[in-house]
Amino acid sequence: MMKINVYSEKSGNFASDSKKKPMIIIESKKKKLETLKKEYPDAMIIDVTSHAQDEFVKFSPFYPNGGIPVPFTEGLVAVSVEGIWQGLKVFENVDIDTSLFSKRDMKNMKRTTRKYGPIRGHRKGVRGEELLGYLTARKLIYLPCYKWVLENKLQKLVTAIRVISKNKPVVLLDYNTNPDVYNPKSPLSHASLIKAYIEGNYPE
């Protein structure tokens, strides 16, 4: 397991310049590691997927960081972002599944149209009557949930990436590389949200 130190800008480990801009690149987890090392010989390569073998696995939306407020549902929390996203889906013949809010093993969490039929939308809260379209749900459910995790559960690791990225390139690996919140054709890259958060332009 890789160990990462959180470097302080006041320490001598990295002579960090607060004016330096972070150098963060998003790449596909499907690329061979040897290829990535050739393309980015000076970079630190960090896997932020659910298959990461170190503490950066906590960045995965599937990871049970715990205590995440379920949007539009006062008093209810879930253990993972993916559990909320999948749990609030409503299909033609199947409603929400709140059991996913407490699922910790990161397995078999996706609820698909192949299994449940056409999706109608995401319910706006567990007890809500309104169904949100895909992009609206992405903005009102997924984005705030993931931001909450970054701000409340992962600040130590966020700081590590921020400081390192000001001194050398950081490559974040994700299975999805779509950074466009408004592109419905591809799942949103959570690695791109980490990058955006560190660069101060997290989508709202």
Language model features: what each stretch is:
Residues 4-7, 14-204:
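Charged, low-complexity intrinsically disordered segments
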